[in-house]
């Protein structure tokens, strides 16, 4: 009988915890109007920021493609954002 009582108590506590969690989640979640306002404020909405992010992605992709095509360690270049040309130092570290 005590085991059944403990199981019912644990079930009730878990149910109450789930109910409180669901209620808190419903209170914290922004409404549709707030979601739209947040989307308008995102940095990707501004053309300059979008262009900058696209350029950065292009440079990163070009660097990764070059690194895949060569045996040189492009990570050791002083200016790895500029493309090609051997990097000036031979690709190695100097002591």
From Swiss-Prot:
The chain crosses the membrane at residues 8-28. It is a single-pass membrane protein. Residues 29-95 are mitochondrial intermembrane. GO terms for molecular function: cardiolipin binding; phosphatidic acid binding. Residues 23-80 are annotated as: Mediates lipid-binding. Residues 1-7 are mitochondrial matrix. The keyword Membrane applies. GO terms for cellular component: cytosol; mitochondrial inner membrane; nucleoplasm. The keyword Cell division does not apply. It is found in: Mitochondrion inner membrane. Associates with the ubiquinol-cytochrome c reductase complex (mitochondrial respiratory chain complex III(CIII) or cytochrome b-c1 complex). Interacts with UQCC1. Forms a complex, named COMC, composed of UQCC1, UQCC2; UQCC3 and UQCC4; mediates MT-CYB hemylation and association with the first nuclear-encoded complex III subunit UQCRQ. Required for the assembly of the ubiquinol-cytochrome c reductase complex (mitochondrial respiratory chain complex III or cytochrome b-c1 complex), mediating cytochrome b recruitment and probably stabilization within the complex. Thereby, plays an important role in ATP production by mitochondria. Cardiolipin-binding protein, it may also control the cardiolipin composition of mitochondria membranes and their morphology. PANTHER family: UBIQUINOL-CYTOCHROME-C REDUCTASE COMPLEX ASSEMBLY FACTOR 3. This is Ubiquinol-cytochrome-c reductase complex assembly factor 3. It comes from Bos taurus.
């Amino acid at each position: 009988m005590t085991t059944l009582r403990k199981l019912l108590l644990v079930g009730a506590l878990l149910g109450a915890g789930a109910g409180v969690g669901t209620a808190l989640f419903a209170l914290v979640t922004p409404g549709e109007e707030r979601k739209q306002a947040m989307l308008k404020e995102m940095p990707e909405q501004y053309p300059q920021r979008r262009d900058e992010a696209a350029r950065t992605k292009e440079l990163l992709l070009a660097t990764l493609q070059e690194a895949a095509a060569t045996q040189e360690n492009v990570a050791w270049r002083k200016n790895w954002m500029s493309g090609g040309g051997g990097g000036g130092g031979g690709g190695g570290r100097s002591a």
